[in-house]
Every structure is written in C-alpha cells, then in structure tokens.
C-alpha cells in the first residue's frame, strides 16, 4: 500500500492545510497473524522502537478495540526530515495495508486520527494535516481537531517541489515552532484569515489564482525563512520564472511552487539554478495532486 508525499501549510494554512502530491511515496507491506503486537522494519534506516508506525498501530488498536500480531515492512521513498510528510506517510501506508490485509472496515477518519497521534513519535505532538493528505489525497483542510474533522478537495493543480540536500536539523519541528511569533496584530490576523479563505476557495474551485493568494503569508514564513536553506533565492527565482505561488513545504527545508503547465519546466529549472548558486545539491520535481492511500 502506498501513501503519497505531502506539503503542509502552503503559506497561510499553517497546521490546517496540506496537499498530497506524486513527487514521492512511502510503501508498506504487512503480514497479519493471531496474537497481539507490532514489529516494524524500515528499509534503509532505523528510527528506533518509538516510531510513528508503531505508535499509530497502538492508537488504532485502541480505537477499534482489537489487537493483532502485525509484521510491517516500510519502504519510504520520501526524503526524510525534509518537510514532505515522510513519517506520517509511513504510518498511513502501514495502517491502510493492515486494514486491507485484515479485512477490516474502518472509517477513514480513524486512520487519520491514529496516524496523527502517531506523529508524537516524530514531532513531539499530534499533527493531522500531513497524515490527512497522505490518507485521503487531494487537498485537505483540518477544520477541527477535537473532534477531528477533515474536509477533502480534489483540485487540479500543478506544483514544483524543491528538496535541498542539507544536513537535518535536530528536533527540527520543535525548533521551527519555537521561532513563531506568540502574538500578531489584529490587522495581520484579518489578512491571514482572508488568505486562508482564498486557499480553501481555490481548492474548492480548482482556481490556482486563489490558491496562490493563500500561499502568501506574513506570519509563519518570515519567522521560518532564515532556517530554510536557499529560501530567498529559490522564492525569487521561482516567481520570476512564472510561479503563481511559493511556500515552505511543512517545516522545510523543502519548498513548493504553484505553477501552470506553461511555466512548470521554467520554474523547475529556476529552482535548480537557485540551489546551485547557493552551493546546494537539490532534487527538483514537477508534481501533480495525488490520491491518498485510502482511495477515498
């Protein structure tokens, strides 16, 4: 079972918006037997026993009132610690594979909730935006966390994803949250509300112009930009090459540019050039909106 990479926040949609795209994917294989326990093997790396997949399974078992002996193998092709939802996609792919293999019926929201709670292992607190995108696909808006409610849209949008090859920042998510402002002026709050509304309206109508308006952000991105390698040059080059919008992907260091067909190649080349001029190796891909692991 595969779950796609995701880009959360998209500018003004901090902690509530994510889009699934086909730039990368995580794949999980499971074997289900009688008994109770979860054994997880990750191809190519070892996150330790306290990982998002194991924790997500514990939450799912509690929610369903069941327990099974599950052997999981995760093949995660999403670059790790790059702001592309790698940990959440691993958990979603594993839970979706288990539900299919065990012949269970589970509400998609339960999978999103269990995987989101599993994010505590990677980020220190629950996060539902990335996992909702990986599970449901399309563009998602987390409208409530208690109770959990997620709205999915299926917009036809095109992105260019830039992934710089830089050393991971220890406890990156915690750091990137610690730099955020604790208060904002009321005028800024109103402007941010308008931009989030533009994001949602753009998703609902597949209107890239509205989505681009929502990708402009005066609260989170200015605080995080100094910690994102090559951000200023990448943003400038992408917009000059015809990108409609530009944002940090999740907590970075990856970035995502909204493009149209006409400018996708030019923006991809511009991002690659920006990273090269910064002395950074990077992978830059054109990506479409993807379906989620649950196929809903």
Swiss-Prot record:
Q: Which Pfam families match?
A: GHMP_kinases_C, GHMP_kinases_N
Instruction: Tell me which GO cellular component terms the UniProt record holds.
Output: cytoplasm
In terms of InterPro entries, this protein maps to: GHMP_kinase_C_dom (IPR013750), GHMP_kinase_C_sf (IPR036554), GHMP_kinase_N_dom (IPR006204), GHMP_knse_ATP-bd_CS (IPR006203), Homoserine_kinase (IPR000870), Ribosomal_Su5_D2-typ_SF (IPR020568), Ribsml_uS5_D2-typ_fold_subgr (IPR014721)
Q: Name one GO molecular function term.
A: ATP binding
- Report the enzyme's class at the first EC level: transferase
Where on this chain does ATP bind?
79-89
Q: What is its EC number?
A: 2.7.1.39
Instruction: Please tell me whether the keyword Transferase is annotated for this protein.
Output: yes
Q: Which residues form a coiled coil?
A: none
Reactions listed under catalytic activity: L-homoserine + ATP = O-phospho-L-homoserine + ADP + H(+)
**Which key words tag this protein in UniProt?**
Amino-acid biosynthesis, ATP-binding, Cytoplasm, Kinase, Nucleotide-binding, Threonine biosynthesis, Transferase
- Which pathway does this chain act in? Amino-acid biosynthesis; L-threonine biosynthesis; L-threonine from L-aspartate: step 4/5
**What is the purpose of this protein?**
Catalyzes the ATP-dependent phosphorylation of L-homoserine to L-homoserine phosphate.
**Protein name, as recorded:** Homoserine kinase
Organism, scientific name: Pyrobaculum calidifontis (strain DSM 21063 / JCM 11548 / VA1)
């Amino acid at each position: 079972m595969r779950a796609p990479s995701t880009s959360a926040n998209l500018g003004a949609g901090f902690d509530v918006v994510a889009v699934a795209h086909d730039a990368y994917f995580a794949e999980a294989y499971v074997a289900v037997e009688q008994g109770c326990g979860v054994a997880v093997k990750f191809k190519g790396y070892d996150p330790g026993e306290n990982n998002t997949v194991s924790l997500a399974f514990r939450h799912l078992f509690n929610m369903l009132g069941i327990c099974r002996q599950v052997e999981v193998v995760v093949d995660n092709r999403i670059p790790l610690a790059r702001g592309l939802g790698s940990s959440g996609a691993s958990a979603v792919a594993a839970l979706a594979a288990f539900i299919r293999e065990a012949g269970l019926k589970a509400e998609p929201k339960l999978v999103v909730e269990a995987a989101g709670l599993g994010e505590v292992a990677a980020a220190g607190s629950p996060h539902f935006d990335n996992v909702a995108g990986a599970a449901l696909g399309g563009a998602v808006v987390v409208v409530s966390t208690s109770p959990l409610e997620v709205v999915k849209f299926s917009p036809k949008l095109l992105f260019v994803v830039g992934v710089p090859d830089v050393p991971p920042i220890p406890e990156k998510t915690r750091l990137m949250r610690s730099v955020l402002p604790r208060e904002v002026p009321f005028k800024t709050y109103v402007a941010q509300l308008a931009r989030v509304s533009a994001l949602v309206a753009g998703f609902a109508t597949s209107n890239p112009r509205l989505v681009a308006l929502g990708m402009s952000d005066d609260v989170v991105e200015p605080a995080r930009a100094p910690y994102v390698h090559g951000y200023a040059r990448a943003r400038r080059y992408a917009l000059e090459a015809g990108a409609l919008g530009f944002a940090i992907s999740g907590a970075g260091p990856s970035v995502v540019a909204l493009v149209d067909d006409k400018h996708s190649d030019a923006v991809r080349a511009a991002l690659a050039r920006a990273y090269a001029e910064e002395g950074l190796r990077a992978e830059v891909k054109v990506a479409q909106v993807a379906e989620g692991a649950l196929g809903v």
